[in-house]
Regions:
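Short coil/turn motifs at secondary-structure junctions
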Residues: 95, 110, 122-124
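Conserved short hydrophobic interaction patches
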Residues: 54, 58-62, 136-139, 143
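Glycine-rich, often proline-containing surface loops adjacent to acidic residues and nearby aromatics
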Residues: 31-36, 84-85, 112-118
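Surface-exposed amphipathic alpha-helical segments
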Residues: 8-18, 115-143
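Secretory pathway targeting signatures of secreted, lumenal, and periplasmic proteins
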Residues: 2-53
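Short glycine/proline-enriched loop/turn "hinge" motifs that connect secondary-structure elements
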Residues: 27-29, 106-111
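Loop/helix-junction capping segments adjacent to catalytic residues or to phosphate/diphosphate-binding pockets
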Residues: 45, 97, 126-127
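Signature of long, low-cysteine stretches enriched in small and polar/charged residues
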Residues: 56-107
Length: 143
């Protein structure tokens, strides 16, 4: 039997184990920022870099007015429990408004699943926003 834990409930899904494609969206109203946590399966023969390349191709098709910085190696989590991931900055137009995003992605330890954190704001990120993002990345822990 597969059980699935969400923030509010545990669902009994019987014998069928679905792919976890869930999104969590957290809004920080006073900052006007949003943190989106997304999960997706990664094919067994693909690396994190290849999975990110696939994701970027999809994003580019959806938004022509988008700029991405090259992905850089980043550390997610605390000291001995950290994982290496990739981080990039993204700027895109949503309608007539610019959105600024910082994105970090990693493979979930022991699984062939990608976890993506996307921190965004409708306008430039302030130094305080960037510090907040770094704290979120630095304190990440896997369940």
């Amino acid at each position: 039997m597969t059980e699935y834990l969400t923030h509010d409930v545990i669902l009994n899904l019987g014998d069928e184990a679905p792919e976890d494609l869930t999104l969590n969206m957290l809004r920080f109203a006073s900052r006007q920022t949003t943190l989106v946590i997304a999960r997706s399966p990664v094919e067994n023969n693909k690396t994190l870099e290849e999975a990110l390349d696939d994701q970027q191709k999809i994003l580019r098709k959806k938004s022509q007015a988008m700029t991405l910085t090259p992905a850089q190696v980043t550390r997610l989590g605390r000291n001995e429990h950290h994982v290496d991931g990739r981080e990039m900055a993204i700027q895109m137009m949503v309608g007539d408004k610019p959105y600024y995003q910082l994105q970090a992605a990693c493979l979930v330890p022991g699984q062939q699943r990608m976890l993506v954190l996307n921190y965004s704001k409708p306008g430039p990120l302030s130094d305080d926003d960037i510090s907040h993002w770094r704290a979120i990345k630095g304190e990440l822990r896997f369940a």
